[in-house]
A protein has these predicted regions:
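Short microdomains enriched in Cys/His and/or Lys/Arg
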Residues: 82-91
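Electrostatic cytochrome c docking/interface patches
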Residues: 25-55
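N-terminal export/membrane-targeting signals
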Residues: 1-23
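Alpha-helical hairpin
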Residues: 44, 89, 115-116
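Extracytoplasmic/secreted proteins, especially bacterial periplasmic and envelope-associated proteins
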Residues: 44-47, 51, 55, 96, ...
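Periplasmic/extracellular electron-transfer cofactor-ligation site
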Residues: 32, 47, 53-79, 107-110, ...
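Axial heme c-ligation environment in periplasmic c-type cytochrome domains
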Residues: 22-24, 75-82, 100-131
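Short Fe-S-cluster ligation motifs
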Residues: 90-100, 104
Length: 131
């Protein structure tokens, strides 16, 4: 009986290990030069940051949380979400942040149609700078 229980437990345990899917390894972003050269004209602007906070809560927070990539929807994604509070992320150009946040790729959705107003897009980037 003990051998049977051990065998069943071993099989169940082994199958449970197979059900876990590791997050996708972080791959480099291929950002076109035209985006890399873009500048945020609203950087540091209090009104833009306030607007950006509202827009971020609507469109970004469910996955990104408060910038660490730990929002309530994050666990359901295959891709590890970028931590936008790190020095490495903050060192990116305005245009790189714009491309990553607005154009997106893979599981990061494209927000160009959902957020058609350029000022609102940059407001989100301005708010993200404060996280």
């Amino acid at each position: 009986m003990k051998k049977l229980l051990f065998a069943v437990f071993s099989i169940v345990f082994s199958l449970s290990l197979l059900s876990f899917v590791a997050p996708q390894a972080k791959k480099a972003w291929d950002i076109p030069a035209k985006y890399k050269a873009m500048k945020n004209k609203k950087k540091g602007d209090a009104a833009a940051i306030t607007l950006g906070k509202t827009m971020y809560a609507k469109s970004c927070k469910s996955c990104h949380g408060m910038g660490k990539g730990d929002g309530p929807k994050a666990g359901a994604l295959k891709t590890k979400i970028e931590d936008i509070t790190t020095k490495e992320y903050k060192a990116k150009s305005d245009g790189e942040k714009y491309f990553m946040s607005i154009v997106g790729r893979d599981e990061m959705p494209n927000f160009e149609k959902k957020i058609p107003d350029e000022e609102e897009r940059w407001a989100i980037i301005s708010y993200m700078e404060t996280l």
